[in-house]
């Protein structure tokens, strides 16, 4: 966005800071990832993990989940008040994988949440370091975005499964704060709002009384977050209507679904940040690097540089392709699940294939999977170029939004056209233009019809060599303009289930 007036950058959101200059932001983000690294090293010591085991992404995820669970106040309170059989509300744990006699073994560990909180605070100068926790949540969310499809969730709320490119951050927990809200896609916000409205329709007391007042405040806040993602006046005006509705019901659901569809062409601004697994930060801290002193950014060259020199391993199931597993994790690390495959492939320097062609399941291993046949391999997370992550939807100029494509929400600020099948998208817009939002709907449809698939977005923006840390010589790639690349076409991945 050109107007950086009152907006805080995402690093500021990420670190909970007020307005800071670039150096202060780099230092506080550095402090945040440094804290994650120190925590990870300490956990590896506690668990007596070997160097190799500490670089295993599955172990990293277990350790990350433990600290997130230890700080989940709401759930902890709930567990204490509703004791369930065999679940100790004061403990947290998960599978840790160890190498024994040339084989991988699974060991289930349990820790006091209090102990985990102590280690985390100790690694973060005695503070709760909520920003670091949110950072881990966003990494898990990015991994889910790359791994699972949300078709069922979309259909349940009355949306079209082809709108999956709008679903970034759909598995983020509610407590992920401003940094979490920034990375949520338009579809994710719409889905949260629809669920809320549906509860209100079914439960007479949802909007009533003291609780109802809090619910109403949450509803309006979510509406404002979504409004802030839209870049055209008509879309924003429609959001005002939805927010101000006295008694939100089916009319509002209709409006929200209309807005979600419109976002396929008039794209919303959704932040992208490269959040890496804790073990990567741990490796770097262990090598003596001082993140806080050197500074760090989630949207520049830094994450690329870290991945360039970090060796991370993953468990591999018998019929999985290690190269495909690497692609999945690479996409998750750069929050590129909804990026155009042409752009991702160019940056990565190897062809990034659509998910329907991947021979790999998710990164996490279920507790009933057989460890006897598990192997491990190095994840190839390096890239050929780096590019700046974007916060815009790639609309060509501020007011008139540009072409979009079913299934692209740009991650990298790199010049390209955003091809789309206008007929497919516009077919969804027949019918209802009456009612109180008719003029806005008409205006939105008019803008969508005038969008051209050959329009170039991010004009003049290119990728950079990894040696070019100041981003002085952009390499502007040329893409085959006709051939769009969406990760989710012809998809057969499994659903995300909590």
UniProtKB/Swiss-Prot annotation:
Motif (Unconventional nuclear localization signal): 1-18
SUPFAM superfamilies, per the entry: flu NP-like (SSF161003)
One GO MF term attached to the UniProt entry: structural molecule activity
One GO cellular component term: viral nucleocapsid
Subcellular location: Virion; Host nucleus
Record family assignment: Belongs to the influenza viruses nucleoprotein family.
PTM characteristics: Late in virus-infected cells, may be cleaved from a 56-kDa protein to a 53-kDa protein by a cellular caspase. This cleavage might be a marker for the onset of apoptosis in infected cells or have a specific function in virus host interaction.
Name by which UniProt lists this protein: Nucleoprotein
Stretch list, region Disordered: 1-21
Domain of life: Viruses
Summary of subunit composition and partner proteins: Homomultimerizes to form the nucleocapsid. May bind host exportin-1/XPO1. Binds to viral genomic RNA. Protein-RNA contacts are mediated by a combination of electrostatic interactions between positively charged residues and the phosphate backbone and planar interactions between aromatic side chains and bases.
HAMAP family in UniProt: INFV_NCAP
Source organism of this protein record: Influenza A virus (strain A/Swine/Germany/2/1981 H1N1)
Function: Encapsidates the negative strand viral RNA, protecting it from nucleases. The encapsidated genomic RNA is termed the ribonucleoprotein (RNP) and serves as template for transcription and replication. The RNP needs to be localized in the host nucleus to start an infectious cycle, but is too large to diffuse through the nuclear pore complex. NP comprises at least 2 nuclear localization signals that are responsible for the active RNP import into the nucleus through cellular importin alpha/beta pathway.
Motif (Bipartite nuclear localization signal): 198-216
Keyword field contains Ribonucleoprotein: yes
GO biological process: symbiont entry into host cell; viral penetration into host nucleus
Keywords, sorted A to Z: Capsid protein, Helical capsid protein, Host nucleus, Host-virus interaction, Ribonucleoprotein, RNA-binding, Viral nucleoprotein, Viral penetration into host nucleus, Virion, Virus entry into host cell
């Amino acid at each position: 966005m050109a107007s950086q007036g009152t907006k805080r950058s995402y690093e500021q959101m990420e670190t909970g800071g007020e307005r800071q200059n670039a150096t202060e932001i780099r230092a506080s983000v550095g402090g945040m990832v440094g804290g994650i690294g120190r925590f990870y090293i300490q956990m590896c010591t506690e668990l007596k993990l070997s160097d190799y085991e500490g670089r295993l992404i599955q172990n990293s995820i277990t350790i990350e989940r433990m600290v997130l669970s230890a700080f989940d106040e709401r759930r902890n309170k709930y567990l204490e008040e509703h004791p369930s059989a065999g679940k100790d509300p004061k403990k947290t744990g998960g599978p840790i994988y160890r190498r024994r006699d040339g084989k991988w073994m699974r060991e289930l560990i349990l820790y006091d949440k209090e102990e985990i909180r102590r280690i985390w605070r100790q690694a973060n100068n005695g503070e709760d370091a909520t920003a670091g926790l949110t950072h881990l949540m966003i990494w898990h969310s990015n991994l889910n975005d790359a791994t699972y499809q949300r078709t069922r969730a979309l259909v349940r709320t009355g949306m079209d499964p082809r709108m999956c490119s709008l679903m970034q951050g759909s598995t983020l927990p509610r407590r992920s704060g401003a940094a979490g809200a920034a990375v949520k896609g338009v579809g994710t916000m719409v889905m949260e709002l629809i669920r809320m409205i549906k509860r209100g329709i079914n439960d007479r007391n949802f909007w009533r009384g003291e609780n109802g007042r809090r619910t109403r405040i949450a509803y309006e806040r979510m509406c404002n977050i979504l409004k802030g993602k839209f870049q055209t006046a008509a879309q924003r005006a429609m959001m005002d209507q939805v927010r101000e509705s006295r008694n939100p019901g089916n009319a509002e659901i209709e409006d929200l679904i209309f807005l979600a569809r419109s976002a396929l062409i008039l794209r919303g601004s959704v932040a992208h940040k490269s959040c890496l697994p804790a073990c990567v930060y741990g490796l770097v801290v262990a090598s003596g690097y001082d993140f806080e002193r050197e500074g760090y950014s989630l949207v520049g060259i830094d994450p690329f540089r870290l991945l360039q020199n970090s060796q991370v391993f993953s468990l591999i199931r018998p019929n999985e392709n290690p190269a495909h597993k690497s692609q999945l994790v690479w996409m998750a690390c750069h929050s590129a699940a909804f990026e155009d495959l042409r752009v991702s492939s160019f940056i990565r320097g190897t062809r990034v294939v659509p998910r329907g062609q991947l021979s790999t399941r998710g990164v996490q291993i279920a507790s009933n999977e057989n460890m006897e046949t598990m192997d491990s391999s190095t994840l190839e997370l390096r890239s050929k170029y780096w590019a700046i992550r974007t916060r815009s939807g790639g609309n060509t100029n501020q007011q008139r939004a540009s072409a979009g494509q079913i299934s692209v929400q740009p991650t990298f600020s790199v010049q390209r056209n955003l091809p789309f099948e206008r007929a497919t998208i516009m077919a969804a817009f027949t019918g209802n233009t009456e009612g109180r939002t008719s003029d806005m709907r008409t205006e939105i449809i008019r803008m969508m019809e005038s969008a051209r698939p050959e329009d170039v977005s991010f004009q003049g923006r290119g990728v950079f060599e990894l040696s070019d840390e100041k981003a002085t010589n952009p390499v502007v790639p040329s893409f085959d303009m006709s051939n769009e690349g969406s990760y989710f076409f012809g998809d057969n991945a499994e659903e995300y289930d909590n």
